[in-house]
């Protein structure tokens, strides 16, 4: 096919070291060796879900209201805190400063009103789904004793580093997190973590 033909056109220009990396990358997915500590992942999933439920109960509102910008703004106003605003860099018009990186939103997390703090904390919990979805994907990947397939795209980024695949990028698991700790090496081997945070600096 065309892809196969292109490969052989490029073959002589690809260093042997890169061919070995391509081979290793493919083998990590097609011939996996790592396993998953399923009880540990299940415990982490329950912790994630439980944290959201607790935050919702403390806020005294619903997930639907927290996820809606207009309804969340109304909740803040009702609690005596005007909804923080910013100028949107995309439109140049006023918009709610509800992104977790917005300084004004960060202020809500330390607000003097316990109600306002509870609302802000609950919104953060409800909007953050990565921990929960990753735990579910780990459980799916490791069920029935299956090995953990690691799908990375060789030279997937414009800087030629690997990019994540399979909706489960194992390159950016939370440091010290339970999901990272749930990955187990075969007997006689260990999992070694390498920090690539400055690889493109």
Where are these regions (language model features)?
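Conserved "right-hand" nucleotidyltransferase catalytic core of DNA-directed polymerases
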Residues: 1-178, 184-190, 196-201
